[in-house]
């Protein structure tokens, strides 16, 4: 059984017990439980994608860690003018562990 969930403008395929990195959830502390909105639930041969049914289904996950991703370097350069700009960025992530995927009511 797995589900497709939406978090931070991205979609993730998750199953119970998976640890997934999502964009930082600033309101959640380590150990808190968060709910993720569901776009699709697959349970064996049963596929649920109806938005009216999925509106009541929320995937439960536990916050495991907050951390930063790898640093990326942004360089801008224009030849013959001496124009150079350097910038770095580290995206902040939240690691969550999926604890429950409820099934659709039949």
UniProtKB/Swiss-Prot annotation:
GO terms for molecular function: rRNA binding; structural constituent of ribosome. Signal peptide: none annotated. One of its GO terms (biological process) is translation. GO terms for cellular component: cytoplasm; ribonucleoprotein complex; ribosome. The keyword rRNA-binding applies. It holds the Pfam family Ribosomal_L21p. InterPro entries: bL21-like, bL21-like_sf, Ribosomal_bL21, Ribosomal_bL21_CS. Keywords: Ribonucleoprotein, Ribosomal protein, RNA-binding, rRNA-binding. Belongs to the bacterial ribosomal protein bL21 family. HAMAP family: Ribosomal_bL21 (MF_01363). Part of the 50S ribosomal subunit. Contacts protein L20. NCBIfam families: L21 (TIGR00061). This protein binds to 23S rRNA in the presence of protein L20. This is Large ribosomal subunit protein bL21. It comes from Streptomyces avermitilis (strain ATCC 31267 / DSM 46492 / JCM 5070 / NBRC 14893 / NCIMB 12804 / NRRL 8165 / MA-4680). The gene is rplU.
